[in-house]
């Protein structure tokens, strides 16, 4: 059988390109090394609860085009992301807002909060030299020590004094009693989970799971849309790109309500995990049991652990730019998505990127990879 496109990866970028190309009659084959579609957005129903297998995914966007497009494939509920921080068994509202400051200092006005932060941040004189100094200068030492230091050091597996200040360019502080984590116009969780979206996108398209692009026998001499790690594609010839990664331990709990909220951030460094996720709260499941996940940062080992978050520091950006230059020379391959572009994408951003790619290939009838 002949194909027009081989798409490597059944996450959002690959699945959207497949859908749009298939819609205009192109013959497409999609492969994925995992045993399921959906990439890191994959959800799995357990006890009438849709488990976010690779960690919580809350859809949010202010992009009207993206919102309208994704609603073809799912009905979204009215879930609003309001995580809570746990530090030494005391709870604080997130993101930093007047509830947080009331819980921390008893402050009830913007003036009080600004005075406290200004006094605490004044200990940093001159230009901050590292992440710790940058954070203290922005929000003071109480907020830093309680809600930032331990969580950040667990995420990066390094002391905050060793981390570059550029990681925290700014810290959003709200002087209102508003716990909504996102500022976007639209927000929610697809009713029935994310996997159903991918099943609809890939309906009628040949999909091969458990298929490794580098070892499987695949159609040759056709155009490729590659959404895997770009450094792996080029045989790591410029070095391996770094990622932050986590392990998730999923556990069934025989209670109808374990923690009362979808996500709790654990900011105490002595607690090894960074988050606990109670999945039933995403869709308000009435299941008599609950599924809870413990998320713990681990060392990233290429091809052994899952790459989650690109480490876009100067060193890794320099390596990526070499791969990007190589990608520009590939006349039949386009690199897309978080791994293919070594870029942190929220879901709405990767959807917009994939739609633009598909538009270029579909309606403009041109092929300009990697521009």
Name these PLM-found stretches.
Residues 3-30, 358:
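N-terminal Rossmann-like FAD-binding beta1-loop-alpha1 element of flavoenzymes
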Residues 12-13, 35-36, 99, 153-154, ...:
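Short, solvent-exposed loop/turn segments at secondary-structure junctions
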Residues 19, 23, 43, 203, ...:
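Short, well-ordered alpha-helices that flank and scaffold nucleotide-derived cofactor binding pockets
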Residues 22-47:
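Glycine-rich FAD pyrophosphate-binding loop
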Residues 43-69:
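N-terminal glycine-rich dinucleotide-binding loop that anchors FAD/FMN and/or NAD(P) in oxidoreductases
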Residues 66-88, 143-146:
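A short alpha-helix-loop-beta-strand transition element characteristic
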Residues 85-222, 227, 232-234:
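Active-site/ligand-binding neighborhood in enzyme catalytic cores
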Residues 222, 232-370:
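C-terminal segments that line or cap access tunnels to active or ligand-binding sites in enzymes
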């Amino acid at each position: 059988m002949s194909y027009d496109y081989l798409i490597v990866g059944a996450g959002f970028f690959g699945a959207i390109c497949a859908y749009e190309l298939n819609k205009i009659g192109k013959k497409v084959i999609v492969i994925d090394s995992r045993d399921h579609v959906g990439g890191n957005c994959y959800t799995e129903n357990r006890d009438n609860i849709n488990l976010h297998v690779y960690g919580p995914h809350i859809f949010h966007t202010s992009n009207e085009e993206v919102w309208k497009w994704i609603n073809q494939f799912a009905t979204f509920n009215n879930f609003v992301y309001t995580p809570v921080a746990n530090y030494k068994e005391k709870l604080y509202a997130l993101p930093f807002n007047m509830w947080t400051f009331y819980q921390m200092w008893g402050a009830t006005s913007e003036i009080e909060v600004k005075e406290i932060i200004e006094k605490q941040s004044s200990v940093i004189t001159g230009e901050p030299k590292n992440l710790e100094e940058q954070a203290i200068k922005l929000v003071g030492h109480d907020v830093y020590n309680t809600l930032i230091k331990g969580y950040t050091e667990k995420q990066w597996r390094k002391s905050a004094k060793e981390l570059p200040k550029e990681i925290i360019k700014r810290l959003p502080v709200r002087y209102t009693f508003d716990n909504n984590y996102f500022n976007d116009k639209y927000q929610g969780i697809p009713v029935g989970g994310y996997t159903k979206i991918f099943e609809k996108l890939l309906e009628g398209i040949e999909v091969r799971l458990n298929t490794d692009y580098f070892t499987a026998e695949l159609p040759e001499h056709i155009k490729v849309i590659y959404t895997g790690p770009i450094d792996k594609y080029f045989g790591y010839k410029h070095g391996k790109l770094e990622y932050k990664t986590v392990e998730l331990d999923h556990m069934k709990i025989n209670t109808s309500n374990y923690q009362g909220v979808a996500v709790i951030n654990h900011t105490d460094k002595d607690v090894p995990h960074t988050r606990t996720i109670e999945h039933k709260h995403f869709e308000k499941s009435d299941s008599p049991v609950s599924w809870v996940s413990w998320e713990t940062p681990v060392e990233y080992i290429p091809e052994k652990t899952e790459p989650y978050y690109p480490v876009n520091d100067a060193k890794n950006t320099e390596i990526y730019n070499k791969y990007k230059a190589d990608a520009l020379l590939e006349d039949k391959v386009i690199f897309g998505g978080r791994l293919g572009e070594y870029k942190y994408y929220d879901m709405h951003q990767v959807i917009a990127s994939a739609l633009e790619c598909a538009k270029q290939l579909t309606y403009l009838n041109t092929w300009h990879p990697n521009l």
